[in-house]
Amino acid sequence: MNKPIEVSASILCADFSKLASEIKRSEDAGVDRFHIDVMDGHFVPNITIGPVIVGAIRPHTKLPLETHLMVEHPWDYIDAFAAAGADIIQIQAEGYGERREACRAYGQYPKEVDSIDEARLRKDLLRIRQHGKKANVV
């Protein structure tokens, strides 16, 4: 099966002082969608973009916005990112599990879990789709 290669450009690589022109430049280069890493400083050590930035990007492109929620309690963010204009919402499976005892100390990354709350995960995937968005688990 020969699927075409798709390019997803990371917004984190952009010059945020020129975000609209960076989006245009990426579109002109032929990207297929924009990838937006959302980090909360808990699930992973970095803090990045929230729904306000996604909402600010949305008017500048018709290309899909793919948000990758690397956050604790991803269910708290689904509605906000859907409303902001995300087309694809990716959630981390580890966000639906209890952190292993050995990883509980602050600063222990990556998050490792023993089990996943599959019912909650399925419920949130359905919620994403009910917003008319594509849902992915990573």
What are these regions (language model features)?
Residues L19, S26, D37, I57, ...:
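Conserved, mostly hydrophobic/aromatic
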Residues I11-C13, V38-D40, V71-H73, A93-G97:
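Active-site-proximal loop/turn and secondary-structure-junction residues that shape catalytic pockets
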Residues R25-V31:
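A short, Lys/Arg-enriched amphipathic alpha-helix followed by its capping loop at the start of a domain
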